[in-house]
């Protein structure tokens, strides 16, 4: 008896998978198993609104680049005109700001010295 190319026995070199052979499943059952592993929305054949990657709009450009220590969630959040003051929560702590003695600029508190120097800060001591 001659075996057909579709029924390869164990030990044939045509299959490159190293896993032991399992029971054959019809394509419909295989598709159902894949859909059920992806969740209920995919099993029904519909993609939930908002998750379709082709329908998403391109995000608006940020004004400033993300820097070390910035939260990715804060960087992509759109600014709203409703609340000019950001609200501190557990997920997005607000950086403390302080006015310098001349009252003309805001400074960040608790900036590590290496970050300050890397941003062009002067290594000399400040007069207080």
Curated annotation (Swiss-Prot):
Entry coiled-coil feature ranges: none
InterPro entries tied to this protein: FAM229 (IPR028025)
The protein's name in its UniProt record: Protein FAM229A
Native source organism of the sequence: Mus musculus
Segment forming the signal sequence: none
Family of this protein: Belongs to the FAM229 family.
Lineage, highest ranks first: Eukaryota, Metazoa, Chordata, Craniata, Vertebrata
Pfam families: UPF0731 (PF14982)
Annotated spans, Disordered: 1-96
